[in-house]
Regions:
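Hydrophobic faces of well-ordered beta-strands that scaffold small-molecule active sites
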Residues: 1, 30-32, 51, 94, ...
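Active-site-proximal helices and loops of the catalytic beta/alpha 8
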Residues: 4-87, 121, 140-168, 201
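Short, glycine-/Ser/Thr-/acidic-enriched flexible segments
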Residues: 35-36, 100-101, 137-138, 203, ...
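A conserved amphipathic helix/loop scaffold
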Residues: 68-70, 181-184, 210-212, 234-235
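Active-site-proximal substrate-binding groove within the catalytic cores of carbohydrate-active enzymes
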Residues: 80-179
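Carbohydrate-binding surface patches
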Residues: 187-223
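Solvent-exposed beta-hairpin/edge-strand motifs
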Residues: 223-233
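C-terminal beta-strand-rich structural cap/linker in extracellular carbohydrate-active enzymes
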Residues: 235-249
Length: 249
């Protein structure tokens, strides 16, 4: 269940709603739409999670508007995580746009490399990715109602390179539980380089998730010759501008 504008209905109602839904199907997911802090709805007796608009807004500030640094981005997401029930954060619906916003690509002035990197954040950071239809083909769309235009089914208008990138991100996410469930070991956000490295570990493997938010290439020689899951090749130490890598340590 996705609950539109759910914060305009009382907590009393949602508590009763949850009891009724879970009585029918215990694993039914209850997702609220709310643009601001939603902790009071996520205490275990109302919703399971919400659409993660704070993630979206911070990603816009980082990549589209370039208003915050990579360390501010990480701090802001960490602050959100710290305020929420720890069981809710992995369920947060991470989005880069929706039926209520302009397409991410539009907000980036059609810079497809920025959407390329935004998709990596969306699919590799903790949370559940909510891919708005057409994003996987770099579909355009300004503010509502233009963002709700019909799906581009004609392959002539579909960006195949973007589609393959989404497929590869999803493949890596699906096949490596460490990305979803791994324990965070280290976060290195370097403002001067405009890079972020997140190290995660589970019982099976340790991964380094690398994000280059600069428009220029960056070197990560400490990971050279290790395996890059996104390229399915040994890593040469170089990440192009506005790109990402997932390295097996």
């Amino acid at each position: 269940w996705r609950l539109d504008v759910g914060d305009e209905i009382s907590h009393f109602f949602w508590k009763r709603f949850r009891r009724a839904i879970k009585a029918v199907k215990k694993d039914m997911l209850i997702i609220g739409e709310i643009w601001h802090y939603a902790g009071d709805f996520l205490e275990g007796d109302e919703w399971d999670t919400v659409m993660n608009y704070p993630f979206y807004l911070n990603l816009i500030d980082l990549l589209a508007d370039e208003k915050i640094t990579v360390s501010q981005f990480i701090q802001n997401l960490g602050y959100l995580k710290g305020r929420l029930n720890k069981k809710c954060y992995p369920l947060m619906w991470n989005l880069i746009d929706s039926h209520d916003t302009a397409r991410f690509l539009h907000l980036c002035n059609d810079n497809k490399k920025k959407q390329h990197l935004a998709a990596a954040f969306q699919l590799l950071l903790p949370g559940m990715p909510m891919i708005y239809y057409g994003d996987e083909f770099a579909m355009p769309g300004a503010n509502d109602p233009d963002c709700r235009r019909g799906m581009y089914w004609d392959e002539e208008y579909q960006d195949k390179e973007m589609f393959e990138w989404y497929k590869q991100l999803l493949k890596v996410r699906k096949n490596h539980a460490c990305i979803v469930e791994g324990e965070p070991l280290e976060i290195a956000a370097r403002d001067g380089e405009e890079t972020i490295v997140l190290t995660r570990k589970n019982d099976e493997e340790t991964l380094a998730l690398i994000f280059n938010c600069s428009s220029s290439a960056r070197m990560f020689n400490e990971y050279a010759q290790k395996y890059d899951l996104l390229r399915e090749n040994p890593f040469d130490g170089k990440i192009e501008g506005l790109d990402a890598a997932v390295i097996v340590l």
